[in-house]
């Protein structure tokens, strides 16, 4: 789910890098030589994308591809497939049966046959980030499209760095007031740093941060029990990942920091019918991922 994108993206980026080297030496067998895919089991702890803290364990399919002008990352989740806490609703307990996120980028340089590089900017993309939550009713559905400009940066260091800036169009958003309109912006930074060989595998550090701002949600008429705005116009999600990858198996541990997670105001007082509670949308969460590349 969007809760796990930063963990999952780290694993996929690492999988691609390591698999290329492993293919030269050990010739591991995959279904495709360019569409890199895996099945993962993901455990999440204290994720903060909704008004209540969530823990769950779920099944995930993810894929990564980079071929000519096409750069792709995406995943499909079956939420709460293996269970979760009382606030986690998913495939088996009347929650959403499917959550999907994709990040296709299309190289402007290659599609126009033009070298647009200058300075540290190696290549330019039409960048997209689409999020879909199937849900079972309007209060569980989300459909969000971020679109904009992306680039890869030459840092001169043994690391990769990409930047994307988007405008957001919001369709469904769990019944929030900003549905069916242009609503804010996102800046995304992603980096990958190979560290060392470890236990026969490859250990890397990966970081992802989303900065969201300019949304109308912070100015709507949804107030908490104390008369304060329950939503915000901005949020930050920043993940820090250690990933260990082999030819087929991969493992990662993720620490993720949320600020106004899901654009919920931290410490807002709410009551959805089961008694009052305080929103905890700012703080740390974590993930553990085990996956198999095929």
From Swiss-Prot:
Entry keyword set:
Cell outer membrane, Ion transport, Membrane, Porin, Signal, Transmembrane, Transmembrane beta strand, Transport
Membrane topology type, per the record? Multi-pass membrane protein
Q: InterPro entries under this entry?
A: Channel_Tsx (IPR003055), Channel_Tsx-like (IPR018013), Channel_Tsx-like_sf (IPR036777)
Has the keyword Ion transport been applied to this entry? yes
Q: Chief location of this protein?
A: membrane
Domain of life assignment: Bacteria
Q: Name one GO biological process term.
A: monoatomic ion transport
User: GO molecular-function annotation terms?
Assistant: nucleoside transmembrane transporter activity; porin activity
| A Pfam family reported for this protein in Swiss-Prot or TrEMBL | Channel_Tsx
The record's subcellular locations are:
Cell outer membrane
Which interval of the chain is the signal sequence?
1-22
Q: Which GO terms describe its cellular component?
A: cell outer membrane; pore complex
- Of which family is this protein a member? Belongs to the nucleoside-specific channel-forming outer membrane porin (Tsx) (TC 1.B.10) family.
Free-text function comment from the UniProt entry: Functions as a substrate-specific channel for nucleosides and deoxynucleosides. Also functions in albicidin uptake and as receptor for colicin K. Also is a receptor for several Tsx-specific bacteriophages.
Descriptive protein name: Nucleoside-specific channel-forming protein Tsx
User: What's the name of its gene?
Assistant: tsx
